[in-house]
Swiss-Prot record:
Role played: May play a specific role in the development of tissues.
Gene name linked to the record: BASP1
Residues passing through the membrane, by range: none
Amino acid composition bias (Low complexity), ranges on this chain: 119-138, 170-219
Record InterPro entries: BASP1 (IPR008408)
Region called Disordered, residue ranges: 1-244
Tissues expressed in: Developing tissues.
Main subcellular location: cytoplasm
Annotated protein name in UniProt: Brain acid soluble protein 1 homolog
GO cellular component: cell junction; chromatin; COP9 signalosome; cortical cytoskeleton; cytoplasm; growth cone; nuclear matrix; nuclear speck
Tagged with keyword Zinc: no
UniProt biased composition (Polar residues): 141-150, 234-244
GO molecular function, one term: protein domain specific binding
């Protein structure tokens, strides 16, 4: 019995050692398996980090490239702006030169216009100088008409009142002659002024003649008082000559 027990103990011991070896082997395999996933995870992490780093580097490179491209674009844009500004500055002097040329041309046209106006002005005074010449005969005719109107007054022996009335009428006619002689040079129609003047004088003579015939009843009219009516006629001739 005792031997059996010892054998059993020995057997147990042997079995225990084998079991222990098996356990150790199993544990080793388990540890190896555990280590291999850890190593794999570490490798994956390292690869991921390297990939991330590479990606970051690529991103940085891309960013740098973009930044450099943006900088170059900005520089090109600035250059284009400077070029456009220079072109605009060049275009402005050209515009100013064109404006100056346009201003010079109207000035030339304006200078030519006064030159054209000068001959016209010269011809106008010539016409005006001819107009007074034509007005002179009319003024002489006007001066002769009052003298003719005074002739019947001498023959009829007018009264003193008639002489005074003629004195007042005679100065009025020289004034009318002066105004008409002044109007005649300004007007371009030469015959119309000369024709209108005699007609107006004829009306004045006609109005003076009835008054003289009506007042001819007084025979005591000295001839000396009728003579002052002739003096204004001569004065009118002098004034017309001065105006000419």
């Amino acid at each position: 019995m005792g031997g059996k027990l010892s054998k059993k103990k020995k057997g147990y011991s042997v079995n225990d050692e084998k079991a222990k070896d098996k356990d150790k082997k199993a544990e080793g395999a388990a540890t190896e398996e555990e280590e291999t996933p850890k190593e794999a995870e570490d490798a994956q992490q390292t690869t991921e980090t390297t990939e991330v780093k590479e990606n970051n580097k690529e991103e940085k490179v891309e960013k740098d490239a973009q930044v450099s491209a943006n900088k170059t674009e900005e520089k090109e844009g600035e250059k284009e702006k400077t070029v456009t500004q220079e072109e605009a500055q060049k275009a402005e002097p050209e515009k100013s030169e064109a404006v100056v040329d346009a201003k010079v041309e109207p000035q030339k046209n304006n200078e030519q216009a006064p030159k054209q106006e000068e001959p016209a002005a010269a011809s106008a005074p010539a016409a005006s100088s001819e107009a007074p010449k034509t007005s002179e005969p009319s003024s002489d005719a006007k001066a002769s008409q009052p003298s003719e109107a005074t002739a019947p007054s001498k023959a009829d022996d007018k009264s003193k009142e008639e002489g005074e009335a003629k004195k007042t009428e005679a100065p009025a006619t020289p004034a009318a002659q002066e105004t008409k002689s002044e109007v005649a040079p300004a007007s371009d129609s030469k015959p119309s002024s000369s024709e209108a003047a005699p007609s107006s004088k004829e009306t004045v003579a006609a109005t003076a003649a009835p008054s003289s015939t009506a007042k001819a009843s007084d025979p005591s009219a000295p001839p000396e008082e009728a003579k002052p009516s002739e003096a204004p006629a001569t004065n009118s001739d002098q004034t017309i000559a001065v105006q000419d």
